[in-house]
Amino acid sequence: MTPITDEGTTVALPFPTDAQKYSSPWKRTGTQIVIDAYEGNAINWTQMATDPRVVGVIHRATIGLQADTLYKSRAVTAQQRGYLWGAYHLGKSGDPITQAKFFLSTIGDPTNIFMALDLEDTSASGMMNIANAKIFLNYVFQQTGRMPVVYANNTVVKAINAAMKGDVTFAQTQLWYARFVSAIPGFPSGVWSTYYLWQFSSEINCTSTGHCLYNVPGTSFDMDINVFYGSKAALAAEWVH
């Protein structure tokens, strides 16, 4: 169980059967909001600071063998402002170890950094496939002692379930689940029994600033928004698992 603080009251919330976890959990004041951005997303840090529920920022560090131009400067800004900081690699086709080395060299000391591997479409020719994802994950683990979180949408999760049932590597990861709905009608249990973070809003399901499922001040409709079903303390404790 993970405690959740809701208006000053600590309530035990069982995982993964609690229906509230899968139905607009961002509407509960005790849950936490995390944005994830890349160089194309604008952030007004002063405005964003007016929302105390936004506690973390995950930023694209690398895509294939290219670095995000705003990663390093935003890493400094976010951490100076007290946000939990994270980095993700968007996996492309090509040697996964070379990509993993580039990702680690870009983020620097990973001690306090949430790390994730973004698997957008494992069946597309230009994207990282599941076999190479496993190599990437294992390399990062060997170098850091920590297994990255896996970002995947519903289709990719199902593909991983089919290909990696019982796999030791994927069993050590947590899921950053992309599904742009207000309620999840059926979580695809398999490798993962539940999500760690749920990305529920982006330009895919929000086309007008201020009219998203959740609106983070200082950002536009195209900002990716995620929810953590638990307290700020719980998220901080699990951030660099």
How would you name each of these model-derived features?
Residues 2-41, 45-47, 51, 166-241:
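Functionally critical loop-and-helix segments that line ligand-binding/catalytic clefts
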Residues 8, 12-147, 172:
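Substrate-binding cleft of extracellular glycoside hydrolase catalytic domains
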Residues 90, 120, 153-155, 180:
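Histidine- and/or cysteine-centered catalytic micro-motif in compact active-site loops
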Residues 142, 153, 167:
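Active-site-proximal helix/loop segments of hydrolytic enzymes
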